[in-house]
Amino acid sequence: MKKNTLIFLIVLIVFVWVLPGYRESMDIIAGFTPAMTMVIDAGHGGQDSGACAKDGTKEKSITLSIAKFLQKEAAGYRVSAVMTREGDDGLYDDYSTASGWTKVGDMKARRMIMDDSKPQLVVSIHLNSFFSDESVHGAQIFYPTNGSPETVAKNETLARTVKELLRTELPNAGDRIILPKKDMFIFREAAFDGLLVECGFLSNPDDLNMLKDEEYQKSFAAALMKGIAANYNLKKL
């Protein structure tokens, strides 16, 4: 009996004092107050492939991969990340027809997820293409101009902060200027901050090779999250 008690005490000491990280992880698993909620929108999906490279690489596949890596990075900052999709599926709502998926229904369903999640931020992940000039390359960030002047100013500041972190962390991602963008459906009259991130050009051979590389996808997601964290003063665990 004494031997069992001694073993129990030793195990308890290890978990309480030697493994503080374990205790923190258990706090997270058991339930914690997130620093903020963010919706990650992986562009396209299902029968909507988005842009397509000459080698058949589809935008929808890479956006989902980067979105999942961003979700993992977000957890390291105690950010609750909600995904609009987690597989190769289109989204549906009342605008979908009896025969199946529609683009309008897909966009409405994405916006419904965003509104229901009550996030502070929505990040929509996309890829670009411009086959008439394959030299055009680089990631680019757009910020929505729907909303009050205060909201637009916040989105512009966020875009600049994220762009600077991408430029610093990933020089190969390019140095394209941030741009305002009107009439993005998912950001119309939104109560949340928003960014649309074009991660590179499928039409550019160098961008394509990087975007297909899983390690680059991870690095891109990490740099993107660092920029978000810098804007919202989030600390990494």
Q: What is each PLM-predicted segment?
A:
Residues 1-237:
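Catalytic-site microenvironment of enzymes
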